[in-house]
């Protein structure tokens, strides 16, 4: 038996990228090499919110009526993303968002797709849910209101995420299954180094999807 929790998001950019302008461009990798990736170009300046400081650039591209947005955080140093992720806090994130200013600017952003599949057993056990995974009576959790007979336990929890970003916008979905048994900005912002992205609801700040792109080409 599976218990399934799913979330789905499909958003069109408020100002879409011109598909005819998408072309291969170099993307700097953490090891100092580069990869050719399909880079989307806005062509005319588009209205985004952005912030830049000595170590990173932050840009927020809105969807539709601007209730949702993709926030991108790109370290200047291509090798610095893992360090940024290791030290990331909610307060730091809120500080970046608070400094965003609305500006009209040309944007270059790589097309990318992200598929991730992982087991959540270890993280859930670390949060104190060990008993749910104990399959030896009499230590088993009581799942009789969900499953008969009583002798049932969770054997695995898998989480799969899919995100596709293109000229029109973003399509994203996540499913969890449980098995029982930018200061003053330059005229252009180019996302051409490893970056962190979040799809979030702007009013509440709720993050729906969070990911890191190290190589959009996936090689």
Please provide the spans of the model-predicted regions:
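Secretory/exported precursors with cleavable N-terminal leaders
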Residues: 1-219
């Amino acid at each position: 038996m599976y218990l399934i929790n799913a979330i789905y998001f499909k958003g069109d950019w408020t100002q879409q990228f011109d598909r005819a302008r998408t072309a291969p461009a170099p993307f700097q990798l953490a090891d100092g090499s580069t990869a050719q990736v399909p880079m989307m170009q806005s062509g005319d300046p588009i209205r985004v919110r952005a912030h830049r400081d000595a170590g990173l650039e932050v840009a927020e591209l809105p969807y539709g009526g601007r209730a949702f947005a993709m926030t991108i955080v790109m370290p200047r140093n291509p090798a610095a993303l893992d360090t940024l992720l290791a030290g990331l806090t909610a307060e730091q994130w809120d500080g970046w968002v608070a400094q965003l200013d609305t500006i009209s600017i040309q944007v270059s952003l790589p097309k990318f797709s992200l598929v991730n599949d992982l087991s959540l057993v270890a993280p859930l056990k670390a949060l104190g849910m060990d008993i749910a995974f104990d399959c030896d009576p009499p230590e088993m959790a009581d799942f009789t209101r969900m499953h008969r007979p009583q002798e049932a336990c969770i054997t695995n929890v898998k989480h799969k995420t899919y995100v596709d970003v293109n000229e029109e916008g973003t399509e994203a979905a996540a499913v969890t299954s449980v098995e029982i048994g930018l200061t003053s900005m330059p005229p252009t912002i180019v996302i051409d180094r490893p970056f962190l992205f979040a799809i979030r609801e702007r009013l509440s700040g709720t993050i729906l999807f969070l990911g890191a792109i190290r190589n959009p080409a996936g090689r």
